[in-house]
Amino acid sequence: MNHFTFTDRTVVAELVAKMLWEIKAVHFNSESPYTFASGMKSPVYIDMRKLISFPRIRSAAMDFAAAAVMREAGFEKFDCVAGGETAGIPFAAFLAERLGLPMIYCRKKPKGHGRNAQIEGHMPDGARVLVIEDLTTAGGSMFTFIDAIRAAGGIVDHGIALFYYGIFEEAEARFANGNVKLHYLTTWRDVLAVARAEKLFDEKTLSGVEAFLDNPLPWSAKHGGVSELPQS
């Protein structure tokens, strides 16, 4: 296992936000909002998958993730790391390597042939599993994987997202009700703070983004999107 520096969480949040701006993973556009699969309209979009193509930034982010898990959850709390199909799979491999743990991955649905498996890899019954995703919006996709792992006999008390939206009360309730502690590196508020400090956009654009972060669903509805999040 690697040796990690347990950097202060606020410093990590700022550094990771800067990394995301550097690799152009973040997009702001208040004039032509993005439409998500949920039907929500948003002036912000982030592509966390880009991290896998930038080895130095990827390595630093995964070191931060490993340190966050050990600092906030403990050193001997897990038996394996699970990645969610598909974006979480490479990050599960990177994190498992750093934590010295086995890795599994979880499909969104059973594959429908062969063993009809939804969990790939070896997961002993009662294994304590850390679930990782590249990003979490309101927790719905992560709980798809958590529920499948629990149904297969695994124990899931913790999840980690490299990026957490951090703007939906529904997400806080979902994780609390699901008895899962969510760990994360950075949020939209951190990304916006870096953009403002480094003057990456004019104040009109930044204020438009901030208006969305303050009231995301009303903003979405006003711009032709959904006014509530899907329940699943």
From Swiss-Prot:
Binding-site list for 5-phospho-alpha-D-ribose 1-diphosphate: 107-108, 111, 113, 133-141
Domain of life of the native organism: Bacteria
E.C. numbers: 2.4.2.10
Catalyses which reaction(s): orotidine 5'-phosphate + diphosphate = orotate + 5-phospho-alpha-D-ribose 1-diphosphate
Biological processes, Gene Ontology terms: 'de novo' UMP biosynthetic process; pyrimidine nucleobase biosynthetic process
Record pathway: Pyrimidine metabolism; UMP biosynthesis via de novo pathway; UMP from orotate: step 1/2
Binding site for orotate: 137
Signal recorded as keyword: no
Pfam families, A to Z: Pribosyltran
Cofactor: Mg(2+)
Gene Ontology molecular function: any one: magnesium ion binding
Signal peptide segment: none
Keywords: Glycosyltransferase, Magnesium, Pyrimidine biosynthesis, Transferase
Task performed by this protein: Catalyzes the transfer of a ribosyl phosphate group from 5-phosphoribose 1-diphosphate to orotate, leading to the formation of orotidine monophosphate (OMP).
Family: Belongs to the purine/pyrimidine phosphoribosyltransferase family. PyrE subfamily.
HAMAP family for the chain: PyrE
Subunit structure: Homodimer.
Name of the protein in question: Orotate phosphoribosyltransferase
Protein encoded by which gene: pyrE
